[in-house]
Every structure is written in C-alpha cells, then in structure tokens.
C-alpha cells in the first residue's frame, strides 16, 4: 500500500538580479522587513501562497514555507512583478531550484525506537530529541522517526525520493522485526 506522503515545506532559491537596493525594495513591497543590523536580507511574507521570501543585495532570493515548487514560483513571480513595476532591474524568468523539501507520513505502527537505534546510520538520544534520526545515503535524506509512528523526511530534492526513502525504511524495519521477534 502506498503511504500518504505530504509535502509540508519547500525551499527554493533563484537569482533575480544583481546589486538589489534592499532599502527601496522594502519601501515598495507590502509586508517587507529590512533590518540589516539583525539580518542581511530583506524578509517579505506573502499570505497567498503563504511563504517567506528572503532577498539579498546580491540578487539571490530564497523562498521558504511553500507547499510545492509551483507555489514558490508563483510567489517569486508576484515579487518580481512588484519590483519591476517600481522600476527595479529584475530578471524576468529566473531559474528556480529546489534546495530542500520536507515531507511527513506515518509508519502505521508505533515503532520501538530503542530497537531501531541498533541499526547503522541512526542516532537516538531521547533525552535531547524525541525522534530517532536515520540518515540514508541513497536517496541522501534524513528521516526522523517518532515513537508515535510519525515520520518526517527532510533533505529531499524531488518528491519521488520520499517514497523511495519510506520504502527502504519500511523494509528495514520489517527485517529488524523478524530478526528480533
């Protein structure tokens, strides 16, 4: 049975120009904050799609909080449109690349994290963090497994890797269960 995997955060980056005047951009963009003594970039929050965009003087733009790459691209297009309408030199259709995606799913059981922690590439320090950290090399992702059966997969570049990672973890847990019980 295919697990229900839900993307909860997509982080993308792009280049929208060079030498961006962040003070001016902060004045023209709604919901923008620019406090260079606290953070070197301009932070702009949109409500539809609900994302945060970080714009740096170098022209680099990061978008976080999107539920899909498409939502991030919509948000970036909105910001580009506003900046261009204000007379700023901005790249029209910048290449957007996914830096990280975070997905959640469920194992469908309550795993024994102490047992799983005997596997290679795992870390489990319940006094410090309630989840078991399982680092996979192919795909190169980090899987957090909680005692409730909830799973968080991070480090994704494509959604397909979430399914591959989940299948690998599920198979490994089945093998471990057969060895132990």
From Swiss-Prot:
Keywords: DNA-binding, Repeat, Transcription, Transcription regulation
Biological process terms in GO annotation: DNA-templated transcription initiation
Record-level Gene Ontology MF annotations: DNA binding; DNA-binding transcription factor activity
Sequence repeats by residue range: 7-83, 98-173
InterPro entries: TBP, TBP_archaea, TBP_CS, TBP_dom_sf
CDD domains according to UniProt: TBP_archaea
PANTHER family to which the protein is assigned, alphabetical: TATA-BOX BINDING PROTEIN (PTHR10126)
Role of this protein: General factor that plays a role in the activation of archaeal genes transcribed by RNA polymerase. Binds specifically to the TATA box promoter element which lies close to the position of transcription initiation.
Name the record gives this protein: TATA-box-binding protein
Organismal lineage: Archaea, Methanobacteriati, Methanobacteriota, Methanomada group, Methanococci
């Amino acid at each position: 049975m295919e697990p229900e995997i839900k993307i909860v955060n997509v982080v993308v980056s792009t280049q929208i120009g060079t030498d961006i005047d962040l003070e001016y951009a902060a004045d023209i963009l709604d919901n923008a904050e620019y406090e260079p003594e606290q953070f070197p970039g301009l932070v702009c929050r949109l409500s539809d799609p609900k994302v945060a965009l970080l714009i740096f003087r170098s022209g680099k733009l990061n978008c976080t909080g999107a539920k899909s790459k498409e939502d991030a691209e919509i948000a970036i297009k909105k910001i580009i449109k506003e900046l261009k309408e204000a007379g700023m030199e901005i790249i029209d259709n910048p290449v957007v690349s996914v830096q990280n995606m975070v997905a959640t799913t469920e194992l469908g059981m309550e795993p024994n994290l102490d047992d799983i922690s005997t596997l290679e590439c795992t870390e489990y320090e319940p006094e410090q963090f309630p989840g078991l950290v399982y680092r996979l090399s192919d795909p190169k992702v980090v899987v957090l497994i909680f005692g409730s059966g909830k799973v968080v997969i991070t480090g994704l570049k494509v959604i397909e890797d979430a399914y591959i990672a989940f299948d690998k973890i599920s198979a490994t847990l089945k093998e471990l269960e057969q060895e132990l019980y």
